[in-house]
Amino acid sequence: VTGELHRWGVGPWLDGIFTQSNLGVVTRMTLWLKPMPGYVARFAFSVGESRSALDNTLNALRQLSLSGVLGSGFLFFNDLRILTTQQRYPWAEAGGRVPLPDDLRREVRRRRGLGAWNGRGTIHAVDAGHGAELRRIVTESLGPHVDRLTFGEDDQLSQGNTSSPSVLDWCAPSESQLLMAYWRIRENEPADAETESEVGPGAGAGAGAGISHHSASMDLDRDGCGLIWSCPVLPLNGRHVRVAVDTVEQVTRSHGFEANIGLHASGERTAVATVILAYDRSVEGEDDRAMVCYDALEQQFSDLGYPPYRMSTRAMRSSLHANDDMSAVLRRLKNALDPAGILAPGRYVL
């Protein structure tokens, strides 16, 4: 009876060995649903170039997460993450130079009304009174460190009307982020290349709602889009995030790419950084240059002690395990659970 609520029973939990592994195949799944909150409000904020402001903002977000105010986490993007979903690389203004010059980056950011860093989060409360108190806490925590902080209530969602157009637009899957794959592409522009990002201006008041994305014209393979992700897990504090950001800025610039960075809270104490390398595959040598840059990022993150949240098929060729008995134990488990080696051979360092 309680199997779907407490499936572990007595003894070791085996769940973890099937996470990001090739030790088994999922055949059954149970989804836990939660009651609709009585009050929902979204907020958006932006931060300038100051490293101290970035540190203080991240430390404040960590405290809000630890205290339970931000139970659903937050999203935090640098300007390039948003710009790449709103427009192409400004080739004419840059005079063909890559990566994007700092002065032009600031100018494009100013025209778009963006901060150097831009974030959003959601408050879930029992009722409006509880929500007002949580808003006060968020304002007092973030207000002193950010350039802009706005709130937007979603009356339809707070009233439990999950079928309203605004709620459906907010919750529906979107391919808008695919636009960043076209950042360096000079031709074959998809019809929806000019659009407002979900974390762009006005994101606090119904962010993402009412934005129309027509992805039918996008074909990344046909259009020669190159896109590589690196996703290290970072301690959620300003010092470590700043080290990671500085590393990305230095490595990408030295290889001719922009530092396209996003931070996604993966818990109360950690954040996943998503670093994107976008390039034009039709340019000779770009594939190789992007791979070299990716390898350099992965090596730097490993040296700093930031493990990958997800591994690309390229990264799976090399082991990133610590120098302990983990690899040997995993190999024995693999041999026991999949003696013929038929499940995703060569993946996940097994």
Language model feature labels by segment:
Residues 51-57, 126-136, 239-243, 283-290:
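Short, conserved charged micro-motifs
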Residues 1-4, 9-18, 28-30, 101-107, ...:
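Glycine-rich, charged/polar anion/phosphate-binding loops
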Residues 45-50, 120-129, 231-238, 277-281:
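Short beta-strand-to-loop capping motifs
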Residues 1-66:
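FAD-binding subdomain of flavoenzyme oxidoreductases
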Residues 112, 141-350:
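Conserved glycine-rich FAD pyrophosphate-binding loop
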Residues 39-42, 46, 111-150:
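A conserved active-site cap/scaffold subdomain adjacent to cofactor or substrate pockets
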Residues 29-38, 104-114, 218-222, 266:
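Short, flexible, solvent-exposed loop/turn segments with mixed acidic/basic and small polar residues
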Residues 57-101, 240-256, 293-294:
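Short amphipathic alpha-helix segments
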